[in-house]
């Protein structure tokens, strides 16, 4: 074995790495931020809702981690550039960037979709990922970029043509950026399965516990439960760690074995 390869106990250690996580105030973004912090990373949480990211940052610090909240509109090039510069000004470098911010709009047939709804979905779920990638590449010497995708990006999902198109583009951006930025920066994706965040429940029209339980059965998940934000966080830790040092250009589906729907 190469003596320079990390010892098994160090494979998932992210101590000393500075991570930016967008959309980190709740749901999957919060789960990823918490997981990275638990692995030792310093985390910069970005989102539009200042109160939410400040609360998560405070909780990470209370648990012994280091975190900073930065209010950011991920669809604004200048704001994202300022986010990167703020992270570096506070912590000296940048080594992990997670493009998580996004939204799953209410399901609607493509033929009934307004141009405004299409543009808003693409801006948040596709263009923002591109902005994040090019910004991270500008300021990151070496490191890892993770793009949060969706099962909707790999096949047709009724009523989600706009969202699926954006996530398919995200998968393509992951592959293209990985080839362009290697070997300096690794670029990978995570495609979450059914994780009942508030965004997920709104998109699926789920309002009650009974409806949520019915949805779980309908998804027919082999692992027999919904996913959690921390399930996605665990995958993010792996992809950012030295355990994934030879992995780039991949989008990993984390869905408990269920097919996209």
Map each language-model feature to its residues.
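Short C-terminal tail/terminal secondary-structure segment
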Residues: 2-11, 104-107, 155, 219, ...
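Conserved glycine-rich cofactor-binding loop
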Residues: 18, 25-27
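The beta1-alpha1 cofactor-binding region of Rossmann-like NAD(H)/NADP(H)-dependent oxidoreductases
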Residues: 50-51, 71-83, 115, 230-231
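Substrate-binding pocket helix/loop in short-chain dehydrogenase/reductase
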Residues: 108-110, 114-122, 217
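Active-site helix of classical SDR
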Residues: 133, 166, 174
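Alpha-helical segment proximal to the catalytic Tyr-Lys
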Residues: 138, 178-183, 245
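Residue(s) in the substrate-gating loop at a strand-loop-helix junction
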Residues: 150
């Amino acid at each position: 074995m190469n003596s320079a390869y990390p010892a098994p106990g160090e494979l998932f250690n992210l101590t000393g790495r500075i991570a930016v996580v967008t959309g980190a105030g709740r749901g999957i973004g919060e789960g990823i931020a918490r997981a990275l912090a638990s692995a030792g990373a310093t985390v910069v949480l970005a989102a539009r809702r200042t109160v939410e990211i400040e609360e998560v940052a405070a909780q990470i610090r209370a648990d012994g981690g280091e975190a900073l909240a930065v209010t950011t509109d991920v669809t604004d090039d200048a704001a994202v550039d300022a986010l990167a510069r703020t992270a570096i000004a506070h912590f000296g470098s940048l080594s992990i960037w997670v493009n998580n911010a996004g939204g799953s709009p209410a399901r609607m047939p493509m033929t009934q979709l307004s141009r405004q709804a299409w543009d808003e979905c693409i801006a948040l779920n596709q263009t923002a990922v591109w902005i994040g990638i090019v910004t991270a590449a500008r300021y990151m010497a070496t490191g890892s970029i993770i793009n949060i995708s969706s099962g909707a990006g790999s096949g047709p999902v009724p009523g989600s043509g706009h969202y699926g198109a954006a996530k398919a583009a995200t998968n393509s951006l992951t592959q293209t950026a990985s080839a362009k930025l290697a070997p300096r920066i690794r670029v990978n994706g995570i495609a979450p399965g059914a994780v009942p965040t508030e965004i997920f429940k709104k998109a699926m029209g789920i309002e009650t516990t009974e409806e949520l339980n019915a949805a779980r059965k309908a998804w027919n998940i082999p692992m027999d439960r919904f996913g959690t934000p921390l399930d996605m966080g665990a995958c993010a830790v792996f992809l950012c760690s030295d355990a994934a040092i030879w992995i780039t250009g991949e989008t990993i589906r984390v869905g408990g074995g269920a097919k996209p729907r």
